[in-house]
């Protein structure tokens, strides 16, 4: 783990570093503050040395001292382009299963140490076809709903023209791991 002194030209605290020589680059950064005041950060790996096109990986870190120091909590396989958010006391990670994968959501009830696994439409697998794309965009609460932007692509129609933008939304009281809760 890095400390402030390892990177004197960077303000704040470096949470994670991946040498360019590995071909694994840090992307999709995210941050959430838990009800107990702990901070949780996330990132995925992309690049030629990564597994973004197969079983992608997202790393979760936790700080209990307002970001001064960080400890790795876990690695989540099958999570990419994901964002963290807190809803009704639980921590969620919402993104894709891999580069152009399925839309998936996971829940942690212990501050990011363990996570649900999206294996079907009741446990966080929100789409039955892949080709979803997104970034670690915020989940927005408005007028009784949660909203999350996504894109879907249709391969073979040409770069740029093969993407359509959309929004997932769910009622505030819904089970967010149930695909039927999302419109």
Task: Describe the predicted segments one by one.
Residues 1-28, 32-81, 85-135, 140-183:
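Beta-rich carbohydrate-recognition and catalytic domains
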């Amino acid at each position: 783990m890095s400390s402030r002194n390892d990177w004197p030209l960077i303000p704040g605290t470096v949470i994670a570093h991946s040498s360019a020589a590995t071909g694994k680059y840090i992307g999709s950064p995210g941050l959430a503050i838990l009800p107990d005041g702990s901070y949780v950060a996330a990132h995925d790996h992309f690049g030629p040395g990564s597994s973004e096109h197969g079983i992608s990986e997202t790393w979760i870190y936790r700080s209990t001292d307002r970001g001064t120091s960080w400890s790795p909590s876990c690695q989540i396989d099958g999570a990419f382009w994901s964002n963290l958010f807190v809803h009704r006391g639980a921590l969620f990670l919402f993104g894709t299963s891999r580069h152009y994968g399925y839309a998936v959501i996971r829940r942690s009830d212990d501050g990011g140490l363990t996570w649900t696994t999206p294996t079907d439409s009741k446990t966080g697998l929100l789409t039955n076809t892949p080709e979803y794309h997104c970034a670690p965009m915020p989940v927005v609460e408005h007028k009784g709903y949660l909203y999350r932007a996504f894109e879907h692509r249709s391969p073979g129609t040409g770069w740029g023209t093969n993407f359509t933008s959309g929004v997932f939304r769910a009622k505030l009281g819904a089970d967010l791991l149930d695909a039927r809760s999302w419109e």
